[in-house]
Regions:
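Jelly-roll (double-stranded beta-helix
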Residues: 1-83, 88-191
């Protein structure tokens, strides 16, 4: 088979690398619209869609109310990839505006203060990926040398998870009751 210009061989019983097959046997579909928003800072909310503890990966929905205060200034310990689905937001440290339909990549080590002055508020869907449980290091002021307010971690997303949140735990156990679950792993062996 040719895929993206490369010849690949797919055979029944083939092995999967990275040990992922040992941890991920279930594919899940979550209807984000049915999950409750959880306020994490004044006027700012998250929904935990999927939490994958072995890889410190979180899929989320994020919302800021119209007129909400700035989200806390923070360092990214993680990579964040986000797609704006409603309104717009910006960073106090810059001049650009991230509009509805735009994709954002926020690199580890980046420091910024997100805000939204959109009359309808702002929403996004995204993924945090980290090399540790820590995702964000929140600061008291929009200054990277200011006092650390706290950490935002994978555990925080486990704490706000809805019953529908798909969770893969460190031991490979899968919990949550997403809208649909599938096991498409038959015929694939882990390496």
């Amino acid at each position: 088979m040719v895929l993206y210009g490369r010849n690949i061989s797919l055979e029944k019983g083939m092995t999967m690398g990275s040990g992922f097959a040992q941890l991920d046997r279930i594919t899940a579909d979550i209807q984000a619209n049915d999950l409750e928003w959880v306020e994490v800072a004044e006027g700012s909310y998250f929904k935990a869609l999927t939490v994958h503890v072995p890889t410190n990966t979180v899929a989320y929905a994020f919302r800021m109310d119209p007129g909400a205060p700035d989200f806390p200034s923070h360092f990214h310990i993680c990579r964040a990839m986000s797609f704006t689905t409603k309104g717009w937001f910006g960073y106090r440290e810059g001049t650009n505006r991230v509009d509805n339909g735009m994709f954002s990549y926020e690199a580890p080590g980046s420091f910024h203060t997100p805000f939204s002055d959109c009359p309808e508020g702002f929403e996004a869907r995204g993924i945090f990926e980290s090399d540790s449980e820590v995702l964000l290091q929140n600061h008291v002021e929009p200054n990277p040398n200011s006092e650390i307010l706290g950490l935002f971690t994978v555990q925080d997303f486990l704490d706000i998870a809805s019953p529908e949140t798909h969770v893969v735990h460190a031991n490979g156990r899968v919990t949550g009751d997403p809208h649909f679950k599938y096991d498409f792993s038959e015929g694939f062996e882990s390496s």
